């Protein structure tokens, strides 16, 4: 990680205003603690890319700040095994139609907080897919419904406006096998 971003920025710094990021998180192991700690992975990813942008800026004695566009992010794993069973070349099969649970909503909320916490550099953030395919809204012949991940997204879109305040509460260490644990700030 990082060498591609550094190389591209080193060559094209003057032409770049935003660096695009994509990230999806899943819970294939069924470990709630590790899954919910994925927002720490997102936080580290953003911080790492910001450091790369700033390193290239310093090397070039640049004036402009390169910001981030988190073009694609979401929770995606529920439909993986089901989609592997699809026949090839079938016309418009239902696929990637994850049905989300409360755990997923908690992670989406944490990811949104992470994006807000980095609002100084993440200027654009787009949840990947909004209807049917890994989406907060599902449709069928009989209507539409909101999934669990809809609610943190909706609440953030309504209340996450204006100036982002860096308020933090220090909590005990959160044990996770995937993401290095440190005192967690919420």
Model-derived segments and spans:
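A structural signal for short secondary-structure junctions
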Residues: 61-63, 118-120, 181
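Residue-level detector of conserved catalytic or cofactor/ligand-binding positions
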Residues: 178-186
